[in-house]
Amino acid sequence: MDWEKVGLKMGLEIHQQLDTESKLFCPCRTELTDSEPDHDIVRNLRPTQSELGKFDRAAFEEAMRKLHFHYENYHEETCLVEADEEPPHPLNPEALEIAVTIALLLNMRVVDEFHTMRKQVIDGSNTGGFQRTGLVATDGHLETPQGTVKIENLCLEEDAARRIRETGDGVVFRLDRLGIPLVEITTDPSMSDPQQLREVAYQIGQILRSTRVKRGLGTIRQDLNISIRDGARVEVKGVQDLDLIPEIVEREVKRQLSLVEIRDTLQERGAVVEDKIFDVSEVFADTESRIISSAESVLAVKLRGFDGLIGVEIQPGRRLGTEMADYAKKRGVSGIFHTDELPAYGITEEEVRGLRDAVGASQGDAVVMVAHERVTAENALREVIRRAEMAIQGVPEETRKALPDGNTQYLRPLPTSSRMYLETDIPLFRIEDDLLEGIRRNLPELPSEKKERIMRDYGLSEDLASQLVKRNLVDEFEALTEFRVDTTVIASLLAYTLRELRREGHDVDGLGLDELRDAIKLLEVGKISKDALRDIVACMADEGLAAEDAARKLNLLLLAEDEIESIIQEIVEGNLDMISERGMGAMGPLMGQAMGRLRGRADGKVVNRILREKIQERL
């Protein structure tokens, strides 16, 4: 696709948890728990006006859902601050120092004062209906093969509560994550190449890994800002796989281009969205459709000029009707029906004609209907009407969720600046020059610098060095290089062997650096071969044995040279005909036999030398 032609513009937001001892505004620990909660609280949240007297549209839409929020609390992971029953404590200086470190690594200008703001969030993930956040730095940059990318802002904020499950009338959240320090890094929306977007996400991720940040599933989240000429800005939240970024961008661009084409067709047709909702239950009084017959009521709306367009595919497997259904689902229905896909689902051709007649649909009109409890169905159809009106205008500004296949799904309207207002319970925090210079003098080594150094100092390949850096294993690697052992063997053990053993079900996470030292020491003193290292480590992990005991149990301690010679002599004596026929050509097959007999108990070079000598003696 010609990105320049479509006017593609992209930006990136990365949210990363910091690895601090306590939360941002209270002393609770920053670990997650799956134990039973010590107590629960229930809240209902409502939007408030900004300082300019405006409501944020995203917050307003959430409030319309009128959900009850249940919060699970714990003695060690939560306190009255998370419950919004106690004022926040002073800002965690450890979190601010980590945030400043990250900002300096991103070439950013750190602000003089940290002012805490409230960002309105009433989806239930914050008990007070807002998230505390503050600006740490601005005006940074990163270099990529495609050019310089500006880093606009770095903010320090609270992470949200964990969404656990939905109930009949609301949502259950766990408060252990609420308040964990988080940095939000935002680039400017100037990127026009999806590969550059991926590269920036990778670089920022590597920089974050060089500082004190949490690791593991859910500790980092990437959001994409995507727009095209004649389209709209869309925020795609929850991108987990960096390799999926180009696919997500391409599919979002396709979606917006398709919506622009639909808009043009609707405007050419003079399409009109009527707000009248019809009760068409009588049309389906004798229906054989299980979905329809089990519903309390069947309501419908006529969309003039929409015929054939609701079923238009805008992303692989998703249509304009899917977009309408996503809006309707926010009001509690499981889906919608529309005439572009009917007859289907047990609905007959005759019933479709009756439906069209009941709402007065002409040729060129479409009908959308919902089967549900009456009030819920009405609310759902109001959302369909709203989304249909947007379709006539073009592409709506939205926050969307990234799906595993690269598609995106509507979440809520794009937030506005009306969601921000000052936090009055927390004083400003001055970032003194002494603090800034102290952090600057002790900046960590960047991942790219670390990779180049271990390649240079230890003779590692780029692949091995990259794996050690990516998996944060450089410190362990350098600690093990005290032994006179090939550094490639040590690097391979850490980067590949342990990961393979973990996948096979071996409990290698229970092995510490001291246990690995003992295993490598056996290799250094010549008691085992490098080929035996994998099996010995697996045995140590599974049975809790010391390295030498594991080697002895597996019969993998190296044989003396005279013992190796005796075994090779037997192999040669048993294959004299082959040696007579092939000469030194028998070396390969006999080497295979020898290594099979001596597997793990002899160094391959020693076996090769002795076997060669024995064959030559017979020629």
Curated annotation (Swiss-Prot):
**Gene3D superfamilies in the cross-refs:** 1.10.10.410, GAD-like domain, GatB domain, N-terminal subdomain
- PROSITE patterns xref list: GATB
Protein keywords = ATP-binding, Ligase, Nucleotide-binding, Protein biosynthesis
Q: Does the keyword Plastid apply?
A: no
The EC number(s) this enzyme carries? 6.3.5.-
Give the record's GO biological process terms.
Answer: glutaminyl-tRNAGln biosynthesis via transamidation; translation
EC class, as a word, reads ligase
- Catalytic reactions of this protein: L-glutamyl-tRNA(Gln) + L-glutamine + ATP + H2O = L-glutaminyl-tRNA(Gln) + L-glutamate + ADP + phosphate + H(+)
Which superkingdom is the protein from?
Archaea
| CC annotations in GO | cytoplasm
UniProt cross-references to SMART domains, sorted A to Z: GatB_Yqey
UniProt keyword Nucleotide-binding, yes or no: yes
Task: Report the GO molecular function annotations.
Answer: aminoacyl-tRNA ligase activity; ATP binding; glutaminyl-tRNA synthase (glutamine-hydrolyzing) activity
Regarding protein family, the annotation reads: Belongs to the GatB/GatE family. GatE subfamily.
Give the function comment from the record.
Allows the formation of correctly charged Gln-tRNA(Gln) through the transamidation of misacylated Glu-tRNA(Gln) in organisms which lack glutaminyl-tRNA synthetase. The reaction takes place in the presence of glutamine and ATP through an activated gamma-phospho-Glu-tRNA(Gln). The GatDE system is specific for glutamate and does not act on aspartate.
State whether it acts alone or in a complex, and with which partners, per the record: Heterodimer of GatD and GatE.
Q: What is this protein called?
A: Glutamyl-tRNA(Gln) amidotransferase subunit E
Give the species this sequence originates from.
Methanothermobacter thermautotrophicus (strain ATCC 29096 / DSM 1053 / JCM 10044 / NBRC 100330 / Delta H) (Methanobacterium thermoautotrophicum)
